[in-house]
């Protein structure tokens, strides 16, 4: 164990150039490639691509635009979020921006309906 710690300390002292040279020398000595090790690992996750997606239970409500009715959308954003006029205006003008995050499906659909009724466009993620 002490040998490993000493080796780690010595390797930590190497410059980037020296570390690259070391990697190349080890690749040649052992007949391996660092890039090949990554390719062999394969994709992460390992889930079945054909498996049905689980239904989400939390959504982010993203304002994507004001639809030309900025004032009505700002009023609705203020009512939904409790933000002040300046903050709500900044949110609407800075779209796409999240209005609410981590809400249940029913609340997300309700918010979407209110914003769309005011003239805005919304995306649920």
From Swiss-Prot:
GO terms for cellular component: cytosolic large ribosomal subunit. GO terms for molecular function: mRNA binding; structural constituent of ribosome. InterPro entries: Ribosomal_bL12 (IPR000206), Ribosomal_bL12_C (IPR013823), Ribosomal_bL12_C/ClpS-like (IPR014719), Ribosomal_bL12_oligo (IPR008932), Ribosomal_bL12_oligo_N_sf (IPR036235). CDD domains: Ribosomal_L7_L12 (cd00387). The keyword Ribonucleoprotein applies. Keywords: Ribonucleoprotein, Ribosomal protein. GO terms for biological process: translation. Transmembrane segments: none annotated. It holds the Pfam family Ribosomal_L12_N. Homodimer. Part of the ribosomal stalk of the 50S ribosomal subunit. Forms a multimeric L10(L12)X complex, where L10 forms an elongated spine to which 2 to 4 L12 dimers bind in a sequential fashion. Binds GTP-bound translation factors. Belongs to the bacterial ribosomal protein bL12 family. Forms part of the ribosomal stalk which helps the ribosome interact with GTP-bound translation factors. Is thus essential for accurate translation. This is Large ribosomal subunit protein bL12.
């Amino acid at each position: 164990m002490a040998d490993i710690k000493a080796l780690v300390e010595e390797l930590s002292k190497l410059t980037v150039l020296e570390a690259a040279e070391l990697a190349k020398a080890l690749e040649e000595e052992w007949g391996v490639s660092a890039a090949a090790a990554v390719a062999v690992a394969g994709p992460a996750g390992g889930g079945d691509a054909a498996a049905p997606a689980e239904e989400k239970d939390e959504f982010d409500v993203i304002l994507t635009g004001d639809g030309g009715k900025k004032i009505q959308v700002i009023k609705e954003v203020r009512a939904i979020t409790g933000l002040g006029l300046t903050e709500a205006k900044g949110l609407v003008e800075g779209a796409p921006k999240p209005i609410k995050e981590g809400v249940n499906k029913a609340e997300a659909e309700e918010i979407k309906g209110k914003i769309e009724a005011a003239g805005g466009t919304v995306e649920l993620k």
